[in-house]
Amino acid sequence: MLSSLGNPRQAATQLLNFALILSTAFMMWKGLSVATDSPSPIVVVLSGSMEPAFQRGDLLFLWNRNIVQETDVGEIVVYNVKGKDIPIVHRIVRKFGAGPKAKLLTKGDNNAADDTELYAKDQDYLERKDIIGSVVAYIPFVGYVTIMLSEHPWMKTAMLGIMGLMVVLQRE
């Protein structure tokens, strides 16, 4: 089983194959980011605040190409709050004004109150520039893998270790 590591050329080939897989995944992610004009074109729903529309673990696909187009009330958007690095998936419930400077108020479908408490200090509303993207499609429950990996770090280490071993010990 470990005899394949004895040949330096074969070990180098397997290492390069592993690097190729990682770089291809990275290029696909960056390509999707450019195509959707979103820094995070795919997000996972982390809480139950959007039930019944979206469940925890749903994988959402975002589109941000319509940055000049008006954002409408009822649209489900993903936004980042200044100073926080966790994207929030909520629905626009009120809109004040028009154009890129319109003030937007969001709320989770399963929440009793709007999101003003979630916004950054001295921020009462969102603007279009705060929005990462609008939800255009989703796949139910697929994102549970990432939730499990973030809630149980040992699973991430084990999974990466197994994948690395499979690549290194693979015979052609």
UniProtKB/Swiss-Prot annotation:
Q: What is its EC number?
A: 3.4.21.89
Q: Keyword Magnesium on this protein?
A: no
What CDD domains does its record include?
S26_SPase_I
Keyword field: Endoplasmic reticulum, Hydrolase, Membrane, Protease, Signal-anchor, Transmembrane, Transmembrane helix
Its record classes its membrane topology as:
Single-pass type II membrane protein
Spans traversing the lipid bilayer = 15-35
Q: Where is the active site?
A: S49 (charge relay system), H90 (charge relay system), D115 (charge relay system)
Enumerate the Lumenal topological stretches.
Answer: 36-172
Q: Name one GO cellular component term.
A: signal peptidase complex
Q: Where in the cell is it found?
A: Endoplasmic reticulum membrane
Which parts of this chain are annotated as the region C-terminal short (CTS) helix? 158-169
Any one GO molecular-function label of the UniProt entry: serine-type endopeptidase activity
Asked if the Swiss-Prot or TrEMBL record annotates the protein with the keyword Transmembrane, the reply is: yes
The Gene Ontology biological process terms listed for this entry are: protein targeting to ER; signal peptide processing
Q: What is its main location?
A: endoplasmic reticulum
The record, for InterPro entries, names:
LexA/Signal_pep-like_sf, Pept_S26A_signal_pept_1_Ser-AS, Peptidase_S26, Peptidase_S26B
Quote the NCBIfam families the UniProt record gives: sigpep_I_arch
Q: What does this protein do?
A: Catalytic component of the signal peptidase complex (SPC) which catalyzes the cleavage of N-terminal signal sequences from nascent proteins as they are translocated into the lumen of the endoplasmic reticulum. Specifically cleaves N-terminal signal peptides that contain a hydrophobic alpha-helix (h-region) shorter than 18-20 amino acids.
Notes concerning its domains? The C-terminal short (CTS) helix is essential for catalytic activity. It may be accommodated as a transmembrane helix in the thinned membrane environment of the complex, similarly to the signal peptide in the complex substrates.
Q: Which family does it belong to?
A: Belongs to the peptidase S26B family.
The protein's assembly and partners: Component of the signal peptidase complex (SPC) composed of a catalytic subunit SEC11 and three accessory subunits SPC1, SPC2 and SPC3. The complex induces a local thinning of the ER membrane which is used to measure the length of the signal peptide (SP) h-region of protein substrates. This ensures the selectivity of the complex towards h-regions shorter than 18-20 amino acids. SPC associates with the translocon complex.
This chain belongs to which protein, by name? Signal peptidase complex catalytic subunit SEC11
Organism field: Pyricularia oryzae (strain 70-15 / ATCC MYA-4617 / FGSC 8958)
